[in-house]
């Protein structure tokens, strides 16, 4: 049990545990239980917008008799609810609001239930008419989310206080006549428990740890200790709004697009037993609170939380195994929930994330202070987009929003990576690991907004682009109008707990009664009263403040956001050589509020800058400089090498990773990603003029201008027509052993290509290409040492790509003018066959003395397309066209210098099936069976998943009959 504290003091507990709540098992009708589940989800959203994930609070409660009436005339959709409590009148003005429910959402049960196995609820009837939202005492800062079916349930917020209302249980309930027309209700009025709660300092813990860095989104952490890893570089304020980290390439970047998080809510048996018939309503109320939080403009994105399915587990053996081990429970739930999800995103019941609510006290690795747990950055991973929430009352709404934040790749606000963005206000936002008080004007921190924007901009939220077909409508009533302060205390501290009135903490902190050593004490978990909780005559709590209900119109009407003007262009990422600069605009003209839509469209624009050539830096490329910058930080030794010298690695790097700073340890062969992104403006690869922008490769011309169409001609002239150079070529054969010169290529040569084709069907014929520098040193295959794999050779600012000596077509190519002369050689070893080596390159023509202006045509090429295969032997194609000086089609181009339109690629062998030896026969006589292992292996012998191998080539006979001898 949670220790109690004396009256007047405040109990603070870390965010992951809200205390041991008395488990009251109650058996009620299943439909009502499911309604409470829906209401809980609705309240989750409202409270998340007002507070934090699992904060201790102070509460008091009162028995009230709600007065409900419909507005006459044209405003017939408006419902007014009056509550007299805590020495004040609370007037709730409510409008129907079931927008968080999918129109055709499915409610399912697992195991024993009083009703049918699955219910498909019509959103226009059944549940949808139950839910309302609105304001309290007209206060524009207030909010309410209520259900008016089977009594009043829900929460509302007024002037820093949260109010929770629900029907009074047992003998405390007396039914009277309601103030509604008889045709609308045949029931009599019912006493309700109204709880009022204020928030204090302190908080509970989330199960996500911040002591390590976060991996890329496609990593798969298996334990809590690796769940919250982060990229190497810290985000900086000027990076706000820009994507960071690796990810799939998106066609539209820096664009604000509407996202829809289709959600399945799951309640285990402990939830069904505790909440009984009110379960579904309770869950939807929580979720509606969370949904409103994700509509706040401080998140800087258009994110809509919707419920498409609710599943209640009535027999725990048929659900996921739920234990006090939060990490294990999360793993079990993630594995279990996948079986209930349709693989097709077009299925109306397909969900993007699943949330398990349980009354089980969750524990972390050291303490039981865990209120929730989720993996980080997994929203579109069907196997890991899930979270576990410990239900400790309506404050579980905060936990829900917080854990969903982790699923959206948000770290805790006090993580070191957020320090430069959040400043000193890291404990006043939803993603605070220990929330003391919520900044209602900005519930999401700058770091949270930056991280979710980066996450979505880098293509990790593509599954959220489809608008749900049949979302479940969420209740619009404020939670405080559904669950009073007393009921809120019962949710948190047990059925015997009541609200402790405290005028100083009205709306800010909910205090509740308890006993310690036989004495009556007040205790709190420092959560505010639920929005909609009455805080005086005509007033209610909204966002921790007690406000007039008459001000409802100021915050009940949604205001849609609109883009403001573009800001000034920022600093250029490079001082020369072609950098990138940005301009941004904000959704602040006006800022969306009251659930209004966030702006859609491009939020960031970028352009090229400082495109002039850089001064010669010993012939080093810009990527070389970035790799070498890590030399002084790399003191670890590899083998006998005293230190590490880093050089760029291009060969073997996946196209999607070209804009990571992948560097190779010189002379060793190890390579690492030293930075998740190169500096903006860095060329993507030596054979392309495209440049990197925020970790993604974008097209640029040879003039270093983004979106320019200019290309280098064969002479290496940007935008040239190929008329300023001439082709030099030759074919050489040799039979003598040792090293022999083929050709010395002078400085200034462009488009160098040397080909050495081995005999058909042979990987090598005893002859290999080599390169010697002008000073006599070898930069390739010298001293009878061969490089068998594809690699890039960086020499004096020139990058040469070598195919590797084991390739069927041994080849050397260049992509920029040669800075110094190089000699191409052939190495003959053993009884080598006579090699045939062909070379071509282009040299600048000498200046002519006459003034004739000839008509020129040239071959114009486009960039290489994708390889036809990822392994084995594939091909790449590109468009090669003959055009005149004006860019029009022509036919005068010399065919002998026509660039190739195809080239081989993907030389690495494909994964293949490998069978093991047969096992002994299962019988020593007569007909038995034998079997052998089957596995998928890579070209280097590593074991892969079976999906990596060709299923059409899978051996069929890895089990067979056998007969050693006939039985006598």
Curated annotation (Swiss-Prot):
Co-factor(s): Zn(2+)
Cystine residue pairs: 334-386, 363-368, 380-463, 418-447, 489-512, 500-522, 507-541, 535-546, 572-609, 576-614, 587-599
Cofactor binding: number and manner: Binds 1 zinc ion per subunit.
Signal peptide: 1-48
CDD domains membership: ZnMc_ADAMTS_like
Glycosylated residues (UniProt): 548, 721, 765, 783, 946
Domain TSP type-1 per the UniProt entry, residue ranges: 560-615, 855-911, 912-968
Biased composition (Polar residues): 214-229
Residue numbers annotated as active site: 403
Post-translational modification: The precursor is cleaved by a furin endopeptidase. Glycosylated. Can be O-fucosylated by POFUT2 on a serine or a threonine residue found within the consensus sequence C1-X(2)-(S/T)-C2-G of the TSP type-1 repeat domains where C1 and C2 are the first and second cysteine residue of the repeat, respectively. Fucosylated repeats can then be further glycosylated by the addition of a beta-1,3-glucose residue by the glucosyltransferase, B3GALTL. Fucosylation mediates the efficient secretion of ADAMTS family members.
Principal localisation: secreted
Residues involved in Ca(2+) 2 binding: 262, 345, 466
EC number, UniProt record: 3.4.24.-
Protein name per UniProt: A disintegrin and metalloproteinase with thrombospondin motifs 1
Species whose genome carries this gene: Mus musculus
């Amino acid at each position: 049990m949670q220790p109690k504290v004396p009256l007047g003091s405040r109990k603070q507990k870390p965010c992951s545990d809200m205390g041991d709540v008395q488990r009251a098992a109650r058996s009620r009708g299943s439909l009502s239980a499911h309604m409470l589940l829906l209401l809980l989800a609705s309240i989750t959203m409202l409270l998340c917008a007002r507070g934090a994930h699992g904060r201790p609070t102070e509460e008091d409660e009162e028995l009230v008799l709600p007065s409900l009436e419909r507005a006459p005339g044209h405003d017939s959709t408006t419902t007014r609810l009056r509550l007299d409590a805590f020495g004040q009148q609370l007037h709730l003005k409510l409008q129907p609001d079931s927008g968080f429910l999918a129109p055709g959402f499915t409610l399912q049960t697992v195991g024993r239930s009083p009703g049918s196995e699955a219910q498909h609820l019509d959103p226009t009837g059944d549940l949808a008419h139950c839910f309302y939202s609105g304001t309290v005492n007209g206060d524009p800062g207030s909010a309410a989310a209520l259900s008016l079916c089977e009594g009043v349930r829900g929460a509302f917020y007024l002037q820093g206080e949260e109010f929770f209302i629900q029907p009074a249980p047992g003998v405390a309930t007396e039914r009277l006549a309601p103030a509604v027309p008889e045709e609308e209700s045949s029931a009599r009025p019912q006493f309700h428990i109204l709880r009022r709660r204020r928030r204090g300092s302190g908080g509970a813990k989330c199960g996500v740890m911040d002591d390590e860095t976060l991996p890329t989104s496609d990593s798969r952490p298996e334990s809590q200790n690796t769940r919250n890893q982060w990229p190497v570089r810290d985000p900086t304020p000027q990076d706000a709004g820009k994507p960071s980290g690796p990810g799939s390439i998106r066609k539209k970047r820096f664009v604000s697009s509407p996202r829809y998080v289709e959600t399945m809510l799951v309640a285990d048996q402990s939830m069904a037993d505790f909440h009984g018939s009110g379960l579904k309503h309770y869950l939807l109320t929580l979720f509606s609170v969370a949904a409103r939080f994700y509509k706040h403009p401080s998140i800087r994105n258009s994110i809509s939380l919707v419920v498409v399915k609710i599943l209640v587990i009535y027999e725990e053996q048929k659900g996921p195994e739920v234990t006090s081990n939060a990490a294990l429970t999360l793993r079990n739930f993630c594995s279990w929930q996948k079986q209930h999800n349709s693989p097709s995103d077009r299925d109306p019941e397909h969900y993007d994330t699943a949330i398990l609510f349980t009354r089980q006290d969750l524990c972390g690795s050291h303490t039981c202070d865990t209120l929730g747990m989720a993996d980080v950055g997994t929203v579109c991973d069907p196997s890991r987009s899930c979270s576990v929430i410990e239900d400790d009352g309506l404050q579980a709404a905060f936990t829900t929003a917080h854990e969903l934040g982790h699923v959206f790749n948000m770290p805790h606000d006090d993580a070191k990576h957020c320090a430069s963005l959040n400043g000193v206000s890291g404990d006043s936002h939803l993603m605070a690991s220990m929330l003391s008080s919520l900044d209602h004007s900005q519930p999401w921190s700058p770091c949270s907004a930056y991280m979710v924007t980066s996450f979505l901009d880098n293509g990790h939220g593509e599954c959220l682009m489809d608008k749900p077909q049949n979302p479940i409508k969420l209740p619009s009533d404020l939670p405080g109008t559904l669950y009073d302060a007393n009921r809120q205390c019962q949710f948190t501290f047990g059925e015997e707990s009541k609200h402790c009135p405290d005028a100083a903490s009205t709306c800010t902190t909910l205090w509740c009664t308890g006993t310690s050593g036989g004495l009556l004490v007040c205790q709190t978990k420092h959560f505010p009263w639920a929005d909609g909780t009455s805080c005086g005559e005509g007033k209610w709590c909204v966002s921790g403040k007690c406000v007039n209900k008459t001000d409802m119109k100021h915050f009940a009407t949604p205001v849609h956001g609109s883009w403001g003007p573009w800001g000034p262009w920022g600093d250029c990422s490079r001082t020369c050589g072609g950098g990138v600069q940005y301009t941004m605009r904000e959704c602040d003209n006006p800022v969306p509020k009251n659930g209004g839509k966030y702006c859609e469209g491009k939020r960031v624009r970028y352009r090229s800058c400082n495109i002039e050539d850089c001064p010669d830096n010993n012939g080093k490329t810009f990527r070389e400089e970035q790799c070498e910058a890590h030399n002084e930080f790399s003191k670890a030794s590899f083998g006998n090498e005293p230190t590490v010298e880093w050089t760029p690695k291009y060969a073997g790097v996946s196209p999607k990773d070209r804009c990571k700073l992948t560097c190779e340890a010189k002379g060793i062969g190890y390579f690492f990603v030293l930075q998740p992104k190169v500096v903006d403006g860095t060329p993507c690869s030596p054979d392309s003029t495209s440049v990197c922008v925020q970790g993604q490769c974008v097209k640029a011309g040879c003039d270093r201008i983004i979106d320019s169409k200019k290309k280098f001609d064969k002479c290496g002239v940007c935008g040239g027509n190929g008329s300023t150079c001439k082709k030099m070529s030759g074919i050489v054969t040799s039979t003598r052993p040792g090293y022999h010169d083929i050709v010395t290529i002078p400085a200034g040569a462009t488009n160098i290509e040397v080909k050495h084709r081995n005999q058909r069907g042979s990987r090598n014929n005893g002859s290999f290409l080599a390169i010697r520098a002008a000073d006599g040193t070898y930069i390739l295959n010298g001293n009878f040492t061969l490089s068998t794999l594809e690699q890039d050779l960086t020499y004096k600012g020139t990058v040469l790509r070598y195919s590797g000596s084991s390739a069927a077509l041994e080849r050397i190519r260049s992509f920029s003018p040669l800075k110094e002369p190089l000699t191409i050689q052939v190495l003959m070893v053993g009884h080598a066959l006579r090699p045939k080596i062909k070379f071509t390159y282009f040299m600048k023509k000498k200046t002519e003395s006459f003034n004739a202006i000839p008509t020129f045509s040239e071959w114009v090429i486009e960039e290489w397309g994708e390889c036809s295969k990822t392994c084995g032997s594939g091909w790449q194609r590109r468009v090669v066209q003959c055009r005149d000086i004006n860019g029009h089609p022509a036919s005068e181009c010399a065919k002998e210098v026509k660039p190739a339109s195809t080239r081989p690629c993907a030389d690495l062998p494909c994964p293949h099936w490998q069978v093991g030896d047969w096992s002994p026969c299962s019988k020593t006589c007569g007909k038995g069976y034998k079997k052998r292992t089957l596995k998928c292996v890579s070209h280097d012998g590593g074991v892969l998943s079976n999906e990596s191998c060709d299923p059409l080539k899978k051996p069929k006979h890895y089990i067979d009959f056998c007969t050693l001898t006939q039985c006598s």
